[in-house]
Amino acid sequence: MTNLAKTFSDRYKSIAIVGKGAVGSAIAQSLDYLSINYDVYDSSDIEEIFDNCYDLLIYSGVNASKYHADRNPVTDKLHCLRAYDIFKNISAEEKILISTIDASRSFEQSSAYGNNRRLLETKIFQDRELFGNSKILRLPALYGSTVKKNAWYDSVKGADSITLNDDLLAKIDSECKKYHLDRTNYNILSFVNPQSEFAWYHLDTILRTIDRVTKSNEHVYQVISYDEAHKSGLLISHKELIERLGYRVEFISDSKILKYQSALFDENVYLMFEKSERNMYDEQWKEILE
């Protein structure tokens, strides 16, 4: 049994994960690898969690789509308020909310995605019942085998950043059908400015990061992968990311330039570096994505 497995087995007899997306799946895979039992829930069966009591709750069920949040800010706010209610009412000795560095006070004040998640964090820490046993882990841009939609994944796969609705296409009249719809206009190269700079985190270290969070006395944490920070001075531009992955592409985006440097040094937030055995440029990741 590894030290990490022993730590979790000794400290936590019952673990609950909320969310089956990239982060929740990565946590579940790590626990499976260490042969540690857990329960996992999502929106389809979340009501069942209230019948149980856990030693550790890892809540990764907040919608991670910035695109949809910024285009539907009211709906997204209601989603975050619902997440607060769920988080509050789950019975657990220790609770960790998986959040985002977009929630930093020093970053993107106009973003509904960041503002709504900051609201969620604020409500948790203003709640006396939650403050004592709750911690927040803010993650940056992610990479790893469970990631299925972000700049890294789309750049490697050449995947569409949004999916055109079939009903919408069906409404195009016959006269318009003679024109070719260039789907590259909906690709990640259109939506991400090549000069935007991101901090990155490898999800294969997520359980080790959570272990560090549970053992520390801070309340809010931000983490990035040490290797990527060391190579890039904390941040990597999207253009550099593409080139390091071995691709030569022509960027066609004039989207807003985002630089996450300020978000990493938010006031009263503990910044952690996590060393991974892999990096985002490994050939094995390209194979996983084939």
Question: Which stretches of residues belong to each language-model region?
Answer:
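N-terminal Rossmann-fold NAD(P) dinucleotide-binding loop
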Residues: 24-25
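NAD(P)-dependent short-chain dehydrogenase/reductase
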Residues: 125-198, 205
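Conserved catalytic-site region of short-chain dehydrogenase/reductase
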Residues: 97-108, 112, 142-147
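Conserved N-terminal Rossmann-fold NAD(P)-binding element of oxidoreductases
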Residues: 17-19
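Active-site helix of classical SDR
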Residues: 116
